[in-house]
């Protein structure tokens, strides 16, 4: 089984305020630009690396501060510490909470959960946090367990076919 690599984009505010994450097809402008337009107000300054996928955002109303990472003696984590901190926290959370067992088809849900938790990490009102979680769950259509885990048959049906049940 081959797993296609998945790119994750994040956006942060100064001092790491709120973040946004999304699974994208690749790191091309066709994939990056819609994410930026959905999550960042025009007129904002984007701090990016020198990747060409970000080219053209200036024509869409964004200023761009570029930090070229390739060929620099400093580590990327020193040049863009907030982005690397978020990436590290996400990796640690996925490995610790889910023991690394993250299926690509469920990655967007994991990113949503991580983003929800991160953006509310300093919430002083746990009741409001619960209220927001309930609001989001009520606004989403239900899914069966079989749909969630990506199986077409239930475990019982599979066990019966194998002769275990």
Q: Where do the model's predicted regions map?
A:
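Residue-level recognition of single "structural anchor" positions
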Residues: 1-165
């Amino acid at each position: 089984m081959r797993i296609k690599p998945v790119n994750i984009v994040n956006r942060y505010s100064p001092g790491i305020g709120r973040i946004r994450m999304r699974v994208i097809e690749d790191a091309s402008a066709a994939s990056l630009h819609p994410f930026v337009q959905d999550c960042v107000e025009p007129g904002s300054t984007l701090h990016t690396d020198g990747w060409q996928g970000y080219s053209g955002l200036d024509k869409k109303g964004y200023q761009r501060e570029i930090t070229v990472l390739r060929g620099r003696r400093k580590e990327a984590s020193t040049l863009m510490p907030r982005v690397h901190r978020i990436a590290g926290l996400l990796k640690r959370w996925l490995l610790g909470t889910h023991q690394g067992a993250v299926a690509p088809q469920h990655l967007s849900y994991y990113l949503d959960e991580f983003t929800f938790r991160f953006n509310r990490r300093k919430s002083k009102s746990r009741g409001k946090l619960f209220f927001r979680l309930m609001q989001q769950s009520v606004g989403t259509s239900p899914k069966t367990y079989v749909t969630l885990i990506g199986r077409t048959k239930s475990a019982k049906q599979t066990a019966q076919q194998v002769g275990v049940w």
